[in-house]
């Protein structure tokens, strides 16, 4: 009878360890294996590079989203995945590439040091490393600070009109003909055209589009600190940071003429996001948040070309081919496991993956089967049907017997708020201190101006997940002005539509 903790046969342990040694590459069948991705998938160094490059090109090729000559913005964070993505694009533009990439790239790095509690000296040290790395790529780049969100226009929260593109194959053939007529213009000429285009763009004189990031205004830095200090939980802070980052990337892409944005989310990262977003109430938007192409913004598409790579594959590639990521502290750096929903999900998935290697791939295959439901064309272009913060289609148009309505009813009862059929939207101009009642007596807490007047007016413009984020904020006065202005603009449009509603024709009447 075997007992726990005893080792009767140490040679058996050595035999098991020796099984993975001396394997032959599964592809070329000649060279010795240098790495083992999965059980039975042993690669030599050269075959692994060929496998890695082919997967990147195949991901872009089979989706046919990026057209030849199109300007693509690479969202670079300094992490392993985005660093590998930049290297893939850099090598794909070279003359020696067998299947050369034919789009015009640019790189964007956003400095989030203020949100993470870093000093300006620490941020400068990181920015100098970022500049040295990006200068070696020979690709035009932009470095901006997160404080720039306080100077964004309200139009960034408006969905742009999607561009009507011709047939992909016809566009490729036309580009190849032009390339032959011009004498096979190489990558260097494409990059030169990009530099000229960026220098002639309207925003090139702005600090936002310079290759180096200057010190942001102290007023914006203080506002950003107050904004993140108002979020009571780390979960809300991470969601808020993701939202502001998306707005800034979208604005820069539109201003500089980029129609596509590449992000570096890996298969592992998207698997974690799949579970965490369900926990955060974003289950309706999983195809947008985890799919290859996110077209919620209309005129700018978010592309995820690294979504088929696991974090293990990316780590091997960076290690073998001298891709040096830059460590930048994040909001959840050195945080406990239970500090946020996102961090807890990450720890949970990584532990499962260590014991069950098919965990990430199973989650990834599940996300691939999710599709966006077809939305009516009028809803697609109507601003009031989209979330004010994440620009996703609103998921709050549910019936009285839905789980969402039950949650709203429970919230009203717990706060001792009289429930009405028209929900919170009609309470936007009311105060909790009416009829001689105080804030505490009405169930709103100690403050009424920031919560009772502003929160209800925001609620009906947000999706369920963004409502939870706003609910965890102590005050809405610290939000950037472009968010407040767009909310006011939507309210005015809604009131105007109500005033002229009786003069409008129904869709059925218009068709007849």
Swiss-Prot record:
Compartment annotation: Cytoplasm
Keyword field contains Cytoplasm: yes
Transmembrane region(s): none
GO biological process, one term: tRNA thio-modification
Pfam families: CTU2
Family to which the UniProt record says this protein belongs: Belongs to the CTU2/NCS2 family.
Name of the protein: Cytoplasmic tRNA 2-thiolation protein 2-A
Source organism of this protein record: Xenopus laevis (African clawed frog)
Taxonomic placement: Eukaryota, Metazoa, Chordata, Craniata, Vertebrata
Gene that produces this protein: ctu2-a
């Amino acid at each position: 009878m075997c007992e726990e903790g005893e080792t009767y046969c140490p040679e058996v342990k050595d035999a098991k360890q020796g099984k993975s040694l001396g394997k032959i590459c599964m592809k070329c069948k000649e060279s010795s294996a240098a790495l083992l991705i999965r059980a039975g998938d042993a690669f030599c160094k050269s075959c692994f590079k060929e496998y890695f490059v082919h997967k990147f090109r195949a991901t872009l090729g089979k989706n046919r989203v990026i057209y030849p000559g199109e300007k693509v913005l690479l969202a670079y964070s300094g992490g392993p995945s985005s660093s590998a993505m930049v290297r893939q694009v850099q090598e794909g533009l070279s003359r020696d590439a067998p299947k050369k990439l034919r789009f015009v790239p640019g790189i964007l790095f956003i400095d989030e040091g203020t949100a993470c509690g870093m000093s300006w000296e620490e941020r400068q040290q990181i920015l100098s490393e970022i500049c040295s790395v990006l200068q070696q790529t020979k690709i035009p780049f932009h470095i901006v600070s997160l404080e720039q969100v306080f100077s964004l226009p309200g139009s960034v929260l408006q969905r742009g009109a999607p561009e009507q593109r011709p047939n992909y194959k016809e566009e490729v053939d036309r580009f190849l003909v032009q390339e032959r007529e011009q004498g096979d213009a190489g990558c260097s000429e494409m990059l030169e055209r990009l530099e000229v285009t960026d220098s002639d763009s309207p925003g090139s004189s702005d600090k936002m589009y310079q290759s180096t990031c200057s010190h942001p205004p102290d007023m914006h830095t203080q506002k950003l600190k107050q904004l993140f200090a108002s979020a009571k939980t780390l979960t809300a802070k991470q969601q808020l940071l993701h939202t502001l980052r998306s707005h800034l990337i979208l604005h820069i892409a539109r201003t500089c003429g980029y129609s596509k944005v590449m992000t570096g989310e890996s298969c592992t990262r998207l698997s974690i996001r799949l579970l965490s977003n369900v926990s955060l109430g974003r289950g309706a938007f999983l195809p947008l948040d985890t799919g290859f192409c996110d077209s919620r913004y209309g005129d700018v598409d978010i592309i995820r070309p690294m979504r088929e790579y696991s974090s293990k594959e990316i780590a091997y590639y960076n290690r073998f081919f001298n891709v040096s990521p830059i460590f930048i502290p994040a909001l959840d750096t050195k945080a406990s496991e239970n500090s946020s929903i996102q961090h807890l999900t990450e720890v949970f998935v990584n532990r499962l993956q260590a014991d069950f290697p098919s965990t990430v791939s199973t989650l990834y295959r599940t996300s691939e089967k999710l599709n966006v439901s077809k939305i009516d064309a009028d809803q697609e272009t109507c601003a009031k049907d989209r979330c004010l913060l994440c620009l996703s289609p609103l998921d709050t148009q549910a019936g009285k017997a839905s789980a969402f309505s039950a949650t709203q009813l429970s919230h009203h009862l717990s706060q001792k708020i009289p429930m009405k059929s028209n929900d919170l939207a009609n309470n936007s101009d009311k105060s909790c201190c009416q009829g001689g009642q105080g804030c505490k007596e009405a169930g709103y807490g100690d403050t009424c101006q920031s919560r009772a007047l502003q929160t209800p007016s925001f609620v009906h413009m947000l999706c369920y997940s963004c409502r939870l984020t706003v609910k965890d904020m102590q005050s809405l006065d610290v939000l950037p002005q472009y968010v407040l202005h767009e909310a006011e603009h939507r309210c005015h449009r809604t009131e105007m539509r109500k005033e002229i509603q009786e003069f409008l024709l129904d869709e059925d009447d218009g068709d007849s």
